[in-house]
UniProtKB/Swiss-Prot annotation:
It comes from Bacillus cereus (strain B4264). The gene is coaW. It comes from the Bacteria. The lineage of its organism: Bacteria, Bacillati, Bacillota, Bacilli, Bacillales. One of its GO terms (biological process) is coenzyme A biosynthetic process. Keywords: ATP-binding, Coenzyme A biosynthesis, Cytoplasm, Kinase, Nucleotide-binding, Transferase. Belongs to the type II pantothenate kinase family. This is Type II pantothenate kinase. HAMAP family: Pantothen_kinase_2. Its EC number is 2.7.1.33.
Length: 273
């Protein structure tokens, strides 16, 4: 293994990026609260001498690392943007101005102009919301278990759509748009399945994050919105919710292959440049 690794210690997940013996970019992922597993992995890879670390849990993780490593700190968004720029180049995208929406535990949104960036805002709604509400409503709290269920679940018995409100009357906007997330739960007596509840939770998160991103994009007249974050990893249903809503508003959504690892990639590149 190479001597340098990049770590993005997030609120829920900790991602590690490094170049393997074949010089291929490689990733590891741990739950951030399982810090003993992270430390064990680092210690078991004897060649590691330098660590560039970023993310909200970086200070806590540093306290557990011994003095045998050279530690470099990097601001979270500087690392994320460097990783995003790297992936954009690898995927042959030529986009200079875009909205960058990072769906982690919560969601942060930035304007990016070439290599300059300005924080637009954010929301506490994100991957942590999916996991928290899933735990409260279905007692399922592992993301790997949630995702398959969202694929088979239906939101029809829980969400109120525009069409539900207008009935057969011509509505001013698309009948399929959500008028109220979980609105039917208060007015019906249905026994909803876990898959339906989880699909509806994910719909709520996807629509809130997308609506906020679209508002910022419209304000600055920006066409492209890049959505990244571990919440999107292997989450086809959430990507579909986001892309459909984004395209409905005449904006272009982009999902990067390794977008959830952007922070770790940026940290690695910073230490190896």
């Amino acid at each position: 293994m190479e001597r340098t690794i990049g770590i993005d210690a997030g609120g829920t997940l900790t991602k590690i990026a490094y170049f393997n013996k074949k010089k291929l970019l490689t990733f590891e992922k741990f739950y951030s609260h399982e810090q003993h597993k992270i430390i064990d992995w680092i210690k078991n890879n004897n060649g590691i001498k330098q660590i560039c670390i970023t993310g909200g849990k970086s200070k806590l993780l540093q306290q557990l690392l011994t003095g045998s490593y050279k530690i470099i700190e990097l601001s979270e968004f500087e690392a994320t943007l460097a990783g995003v720029q790297f992936i954009l180049k690898e995927e042959q995208h030529t986009i200079n101005n875009f909205i960058l929406t990072n769906i982690g535990t919560g969601t942060s949104i930035h304007y990016v102009y070439n290599e300059q960036y300005i924080r637009a805002g954010g929301t506490g709604v994100g991957g942590g919301t999916i996991m928290g509400l899933s735990k409260l409503l279905t007692n399922i709290d592992h993301f790997e278990d949630i995702i398959p269920l969202t694929k088979v679940g239906s939101r029809k018995e829980l969400d109120i759509t525009v069409g539900d409100i207008y009935g057969g009357i011509l509505s001013p906007i698309d009948n399929n748009l959500t008028a109220s997330n979980f609105g039917k739960a208060a007015i019906t007596e249905s026994n909803n399945s876990s898959s339906d509840i989880l699909a509806t939770v994910q719909g709520l998160v996807g629509e809130v994050v997308t609506a906020l991103s679209l508002q910022f994009a419209e304000t600055k007249n920006i066409e492209h919105i890049i959505y990244i974050g571990s919440t999107l990893c292997n989450n086809v249903q959430l990507q579909h919710i986001i892309s459909s809503y984004t395209e409905y508003q005449n904006k272009t959504p982009i999902f990067l292959q390794d977008g959830g690892n952007s922070g770790a990639i940026g940290a690695l590149l910073h230490a190896t440049k």
